Amino acid sequence: MKEFTYRGHKCCYSEFRSEGTSKTMILIPDDGRAGYSVQDFMSYIPSEYKLVLVDFLGCGEADTPYGYVSDLWQDQAMQLKELFFAAGYEQAILVGFGEGGCRTAEAFLAEMPERVERVIFTAKSFVPRSLPEELLPKVMTIPDSMQYPGENNWRTLGLACRQLLQGDETRCPYCGGIMMRGLITGSRDLARWTIDDGIHIAGVPDEGEFYLRNHQPKGFLENLKDLFNKETERKTAYVCYACGKLTADIKNLI
């Protein structure tokens, strides 16, 4: 791990994919967590991003000053400021995890907005509290409808984050939720929905089947077969994270 100093104490960070990448993404863990606690998220992020994990004071390999409380969000934002100077980052995307990581990212955005390209809040039902209106266009929040139960559901968070980064926010015509684009393959009697090549996650086979197997909405397979005609072919289709509805008619999407 690399080191930088904040008020005379050692903080640490690790860089991944540092060669040949054009953008920097800093992953900010929840209160009291080391940077490695969010490393499972990294495999879902496009390869053009350099990924940075941070150990704030009191966490991981960083120093723990006497009496230091590790959930001081404003203080952690100041540690991020020192990281930017030490590592030479001109601008980065911040991804906050949990309430603490999101509050730290929010505080840094308010302090140094010129250094932030985007902030992605992953905590469920998270609402920014201290951002002026002019900074809100930099904020991206993963909707509750895109988050499945489970504290460490990196797969769904990664998919949602990737979709937001690509600007693909197709809306469900039934409930307004965000839909995931995929392909129907097979035949009417044996239809299968999988993520299409545009948002395929390397190293995660049959992600669409994972979705169906673990989060199959009522009547989903029947809707899938109705959408598919009798001939064997490939069709683009969208699945709503919120209500589970499936559609192939882009013109009707809102």
Where do the model's predicted regions map?
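Alpha/beta-hydrolase fold catalytic core
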Residues: 1-25, 48-49, 89, 155-165
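Conserved HGGG/HGGXW glycine-rich cap/lid loop of the alpha/beta-hydrolase fold
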Residues: 9-63
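Active-site loop/oxyanion-hole signature of alpha/beta-hydrolase fold enzymes
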Residues: 56-95
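Conserved hydrolase catalytic core segment
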Residues: 90-130
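Helix-rich cap/lid subdomain of alpha/beta-hydrolase
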Residues: 122-164
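Residues immediately within or flanking Cys/His clusters that coordinate Zn2+
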Residues: 169, 237
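Short cysteine-rich clusters marking metal-coordination/redox-active sites
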Residues: 172-175, 240-243
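Short, non-ligating residues that shape and space the ligands of small metal-coordination modules
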Residues: 181-182, 249-250
